[in-house]
Amino acid sequence: MKILPIKIKGSIFTLLVLYLQNHPVELFKNNLRDKIKNFPTLFKNAPIAINVEKCSNEINWNNIKNAIISCGFNIIGVSGCKNGKLKNNIIKSGLPILSEGKEVFNFFNNINLDDKILSFEKKNYNKTPIFNSPIRSGQKIYANNSDLIITNNVNSGAEVIADGNIHIYGEVRGRVLAGAKGDNTCQIFCTKLFSELVAISGEYLLSGDFSEDTIGNSVKIYMKNKKLHIVKLN
């Protein structure tokens, strides 16, 4: 069988989507910096899609684009564009127009509740949400002002986030982010570590950073001296 030099296949990627409103560029830029300050390294050079559905036809697209890039993001495309003039300006700037499916994670305009996001709005750490089912690829869980407990597997491509601690009694292959609002005393516990990424209060480690003795084992992840540490549990 002849082996072709390339293959073209369809695939699905999980992306952050930035939803723009009709506000002055400097105000929006400052707000964006405030939103990402708890995760400065996690979002450095991160790919992001821009939704302009609620923007007026008179926005200065080049100024907006430059403001987003200056915050450390790589724009991969723009969605929600219904105005012909704006669409042409976006295309001329070198970016594609995206056909947007169902949004899975609206990070910068509060966290939405849809069929792929489960959000828990709590004023106090009174009750910890518990998930007994597997967290599937593409699904995102967010526990607001709370710890999070999962008694099953977190699949590759899934993302679990909590403002408090995270406990996972299962195999972890997706992303795990604790202390999402900046609490660096939060910790992550899991019984089988294969995670793509773990993060606490903006500091993160990728799977390639894990030591061999922690991979696939029961571990505790915590922050000390502004660095993440992973220790194997007995």
Curated annotation (Swiss-Prot):
Species annotation: Buchnera aphidicola subsp. Baizongia pistaciae (strain Bp)
Cell cycle as UniProt keyword: yes
Assembly and binders: Interacts with MinD and FtsZ.
Database matches in Pfam families: MinC_C, MinC_N
Keyword field contains Glycoprotein: no
HAMAP family noted in UniProt: MinC (MF_00267)
Keywords linked to the UniProt accession: Cell cycle, Cell division, Septation
GO biological process, one term: division septum assembly
Function: Cell division inhibitor that blocks the formation of polar Z ring septums. Rapidly oscillates between the poles of the cell to destabilize FtsZ filaments that have formed before they mature into polar Z rings. Prevents FtsZ polymerization.
Top-level taxon in the UniProt lineage: Bacteria
Similarity section: Belongs to the MinC family.
Protein name: Probable septum site-determining protein MinC
Gene name in the database record: minC
